[in-house]
Amino acid sequence: GDHRDLHSFPTRRSSDLNNVLANCIQMLDRIGQQFKDGEEVVVCPLPLYHIYAFTVCMMALFSKGSQIVLIPNPRDIDGFIQTLKPHSITAFAGINTLFVGLGRHPEFAKLDFSKLHLTMSGGTALTQAAVSIWKGVTGNTITEGYGLSETAPVVSFNIPGKEEIGTVGHELEDTEVALLDSYDKPVGDGESGQIAVRGPQVMLGYWQRDDETAKVMTEDNFFKTGDIGVRTDSGAIKIVDRLKDMIIVSGFNVYPNEIEEILTSHPDVMEAAVVGKPDEKTGERVCAFITVSNDIKVEDVTAFCKEQLTNYKVPKSIEILEELPKSTVGKILRRELRDKG
């Protein structure tokens, strides 16, 4: 059988490491022509134990002779900007919260972005607000992709210069993506379903957890991601939300990403997270947590939501926080908010 090595990425996933190498080759096939050997300066604000940073920055782009600028503490926005000042950056690998945090900082706009030709996003949903803020400051479009630790990580990525905003692009070379229903059968055209992946970048399984591996692999060896997606008319993949984060209100499916997108489009809302909490009447209710840039009233934000959302999707409670809970890479932790109070 396969020899399984243990690497130190989150949740102890096993791989023969060929999947990481395969993903490097796949990513270079998608974006490599954008990079001149030995001439690129790539900003990597994510820790190298995170598979996104490891495969894309440390392995794929480093193999092109790129200089990788590491940011030890991306939460320190002032320090982050100071680190960037001596560099004429050509590429940036980030996530949604970083694009917003940097883009709203007045000192960031003073940096030289004349050579910045590729901004990559992954790890968490990218909001339209983040795209607008980033492009307004840097002049650069954010190119979004999608992946997981189990897929080393990249499954799909937009073609630079041909981005379909709001999607994570088409699957990489030698990668198959299926959208499945609850019975692991393909959904119809235009319907949403669980994203399942088959390709050389997919893991062998969870380390010493054959029972958990069996839960996520189909009979024909597709890995079930736990994410809900849909195809656009062009065949690009659009992420709807995490299956486990979906909220069911009176039998209706509510996706937090959709509501967070509306909330962050409010000019005074910086970040938003939406979760479902138990409700005696409706099963679950929609609860929102936001950070703001100005002194605004919750009632005003609720009214803003009512203008753009069907009633059952409007948050029944909105709480303003100083800061949203985040992981070490800046990903908003909905589960902590779900357990809050």
Predicted regions mapped to residue ranges:
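Conserved ATP/PPi-binding loop(s) of AMP-dependent carboxylate-activating enzymes
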Residues: 170-174, 183-216, 254
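Conserved AMP-binding A3 loop
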Residues: 8-25
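Short, exposed "boundary/linker" segments that immediately precede the start
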Residues: 1-7
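Conserved AMP-binding/adenylation subdomain of ANL enzymes
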Residues: 21-41, 51-90, 105
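Active-site glycine-centered loops adjacent to acidic/histidine catalytic or metal-binding residues
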Residues: 123, 147, 169, 184, ...
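Gly/Ser/Thr-rich phosphate-binding loop
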Residues: 66, 86-94, 103-164, 176
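Beta-strand->loop->alpha-helix junctions that form or flank phosphate-binding loops
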Residues: 143-150, 169-171, 275-277, 319
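AMP-binding/adenylate-forming catalytic core of the ANL superfamily
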Residues: 92, 198-199, 204-205, 212-215, ...
